[in-house]
UniProtKB/Swiss-Prot annotation:
Organism this protein belongs to: Xenopus tropicalis (Western clawed frog)
Cellular compartments per GO CC: cytoplasm
Subcellular location: Cytoplasm
Role of this protein: Specific and highly efficient GDP-D-glucose phosphorylase regulating the levels of GDP-D-glucose in cells.
Protein name, UniProt field: GDP-D-glucose phosphorylase 1
UniProt xrefs under InterPro entries: GDPGP (IPR026506)
PANTHER family for the chain: GDP-D-GLUCOSE PHOSPHORYLASE 1
Gene Ontology molecular function terms on file: GDP-D-glucose phosphorylase activity; guanyl-nucleotide exchange factor activity; hydrolase activity; nucleotide binding
Length: 399
C-alpha cells in the first residue's frame, strides 16, 4: 500500500481549536445579511479562518479550476431555486467511483483521501474543553503523520495520526479541488481509519457544530450516501457558502415525532425528514439523525442530508429567525450505474434548492417545472415513502 506512504510524510498542518462558547446561537437573518452587503465584519473567527485559507489555496492554484463570481440566477416560481452555471466542475472533476450498494465497503485500491496532497489540507479542527484564551484558535505546527501509514486502521484509533492524539473530536478540513461554491471544503475524520461513506454520530455532531461556528446564514453542510451521488467511498461531509436564501430554511413541516423534533417537510418539491435543534442538544440530535441514516443503510436506501440555518418548525409559521439549524434527510432512488443525462445531478444541493448546472444551454432554458420533474424522478414512490415514514417513526420511538 505504497500510496499511503506517499501522502503525508510528517506533514505540518495548522490546528484550529474551538470551544462551545464560539458557537453563534443568535443567527443572522437574511435581511440583516443583505444590509452588510460586501462588509464582512459580521463573520465569525471560524468564517474568517476558513475563508482566508481557502482563498489562499485558490490563489496557489491548488484547485482544478478557478472559481470566481459564479454566474447565478433565481428561477421564477414558488420555490425560488438558486441555479448556478458550473461548466468546469462537470468537465474537470475526478471520475466518480463505481458504486453498487449503499453498504459498500471501503476499497483502498480506489481513490481515497489517504492519497490527497498535503497542500490541500486547510487545517484540522479540534473541539477543546479547556478554558478559552486570546488567540487560541490557530496553533501552528501540529503534525499529521498517521495518514501516511501503510495500512488502514478501521475500527481502531491510529497511532500518531495527530501529534496531540487525533481523538474523535479531531476533524480534517480539506479543499474540494472541484468546488461547487465559495469555500467548498470536505470535513473528514482521520482518513487512515478508512471508514466507508456511512454517516457516524461524531461526524454528524461536527457538521452541526461547524454551522453553529459560522455567523454566515449561507454556510451549509451536507452528506451524500453511496447511491446518492457520493463520488468517493471514504467518509466525508461537504461544507460551503451559498450566499442566497433557500426555501428549505423556512418551509412548513408536519410533526412526526414532536417529542424529538422529528418532522416531515411539506410544501416542498422534495419531501424529506427534518430534525431541528437550537444547539442545546447537539449530541442527542446527532444520535437521532444517525438512527435514521443507519436504518436507511440497513435497508440499502440511498439518501442525502443537508444542514443549514433555519427557523423552528414548531412555530407553524414562516419566520426570518435563523437561530437554530435544520437537518433534512432525503431517502431517494439509488443512482447505481446511472448515467448523467440531466442538466444537474440530484444530490444534497439540488434537493435543498441549489442547482449547479453543467452547461450553458441548460442554464438558459431551465425552469422550475423542469427542475421539479427531474427531482421527482429521483424520489421514492409515494407508497414507498409513506411506508418508510411509518417505519422510521416506529424505529425512533424504540428505546
Amino acid at each position: 500500500m505504497e500510496e499511503h506512504r506517499k501522502l503525508l510524510p510528517n506533514a505540518t498542518v495548522e490546528e484550529y481549536n474551538y470551544f462551545e462558547e464560539d458557537f453563534v446561537f443568535q443567527g443572522l437573518s437574511w435581511k440583516k445579511r443583505q444590509e452588510f452587503a460586501e462588509d464582512t465584519s459580521f463573520l465569525s473567527p471560524f468564517d474568517k479562518a476558513l475563508q482566508s485559507k481557502w482563498e489562499e489555496k485558490m490563489n496557489e492554484g491548488l484547485f482544478r479550476y478557478p472559481l470566481r463570481n459564479v454566474q447565478t440566477k433565481i428561477l421564477p416560481g414558488s420555490v425560488s431555486y438558486v441555479a448556478q452555471l458550473n461548466i468546469q466542475r462537470s468537465i474537470n472533476r475526478r471520475k466518480p467511483e463505481d458504486i453498487w450498494s449503499v453498504q459498500q465497503k471501503f476499497n483502498p485500491n480506489q481513490f481515497n483521501y489517504n492519497k490527497i496532497k498535503s497542500e490541500e489540507i486547510v487545517f484540522q479542527m479540534i473541539r477543546s474543553e479547556a478554558e478559552h484564551s486570546v488567540d487560541s484558535h490557530i496553533v501552528q505546527g501540529s503534525m499529521v503523520n498517521g495518514m501516511g501509514s501503510s495500512e488502514c486502521k478501521s475500527g481502531s484509533t491510529p497511532q500518531g495520526s495527530c501529534t496531540l492524539e487525533c481523538k474523535s473530536s479531531c476533524t480534517l478540513v480539506v479543499i474540494n479541488v472541484s468546488p461547487l461554491e465559495f469555500g467548498h471544503v470536505l470535513f473528514m475524520p482521520d482518513p487512515s481509519l478508512c471508514l466507508p461513506q456511512i454517516l457516524t454520530e461524531n461526524l454528524m455532531l461536527f457538521g452541526m457544530e461547524s454551522v453553529f461556528l459560522s455567523s454566515h446564514p449561507g454556510f451549509r453542510v451536507g452528506f451524500n450516501s453511496l447511491g446518492g451521488f457520493a463520488s468517493v467511498n471514504h467518509l466525508h461531509l461537504h461544507g460551503f457558502y451559498l450566499d442566497h436564501e433557500l426555501l428549505i430554511e423556512s418551509s412548513c413541516s408536519k410533526p412526526l415525532c414532536p417529542e424529538i423534533n422529528f418532522h416531515l417537510v411539506t410544501h416542498f418539491p422534495a419531501p424529506g425528514f427534518l430534525f431541528y435543534t437550537d444547539g442545546k442538544d447537539l449530541k442527542s440530535t446527532a444520535q437521532k439523525i444517525c438512527k435514521v441514516t443507519d436504518f436507511l443503510v440497513a435497508k440499502n436506501i440511498a439518501h442525502n442530508l443537508f444542514v443549514t440555518r433555519g427557523s423552528n418548525p414548531d412555530t407553524g409559521k414562516v419566520s426570518e429567525d435563523r437561530n437554530g439549524i435544520r437537518v433534512i434527510i432525503w431517502a431517494r432512488k439509488p443512482s447505481f450505474g446511472a448515467k448523467e443525462v440531466s442538466a444537474f445531478n440530484v444530490a444534497l444541493c439540488e434537493l435543498a434548492g441549489h442547482l449547479p448546472v453543467k452547461n450553458q444551454e441548460d442554464f438558459i432554458s431551465i425552469t422550475e417545472d423542469s427542475v421539479i420533474a427531474i427531482i421527482h424522478s429521483c424520489l421514492l414512490a409515494d407508497d414507498e415513502f409513506t411506508q418508510l415514514s411509518l417505519d422510521l417513526v416506529q424505529h425512533l420511538r424504540k428505546q
